[in-house]
């Protein structure tokens, strides 16, 4: 049983735009989160899911640098309809199971995610 971690990435927040690109000790919040998520042994792959309205070059660079996948939702309502973006991303990558993560908090409990996956597999 495989699990993909999908990070739903947006930069158009009204309160704090581009917050996932803010840096902490030289790394963006998004890169810190990716680094932490890579420690989850139960995960098959990590996928950044963005809309085509985002800054594609920045996300392509981050995906390549951090060796994660990138899904770009094309010409649809997925910028505001996050569920559609998750659905289309999981279909594109033929995901068996997904773990949804929002990337604006780099300090998630990866051990809890690992335990949830193990519990689900039982």
Task: Describe every region a protein language model picked out.
Residues 16-39:
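Short, well-formed alpha-helical segments that are part of the catalytic scaffolds
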Residues 11-13, 103-106:
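Short glycine-rich anion-binding loops that position phosphate/pyrophosphate groups of nucleotides
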Residues 9, 50-52, 102:
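Short beta-strand/turn micro-motifs composed of small residues
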């Amino acid at each position: 049983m495989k699990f993909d971690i999908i990070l739903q990435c947006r930069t158009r927040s009204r309160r704090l735009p581009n917050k996932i690109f803010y840096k902490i000790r030289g790394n963006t919040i998004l890169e810190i989160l990716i680094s932490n998520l890579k420690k989850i042994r139960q995960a098959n792959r990590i996928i950044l899911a963005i809309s085509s309205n985002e800054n594609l070059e920045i996300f392509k660079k981050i995906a390549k640098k951090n060796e994660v996948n990138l899904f770009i939702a094309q010409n649809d309502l997925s910028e505001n309809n996050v569920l559609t973006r998750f659905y289309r991303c999981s279909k594109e990558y033929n995901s068996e199971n997904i773990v949804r993560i929002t990337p604006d908090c780099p300090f998630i409990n990866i051990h809890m995610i690992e335990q949830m996956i193990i519990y689900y597999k039982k």
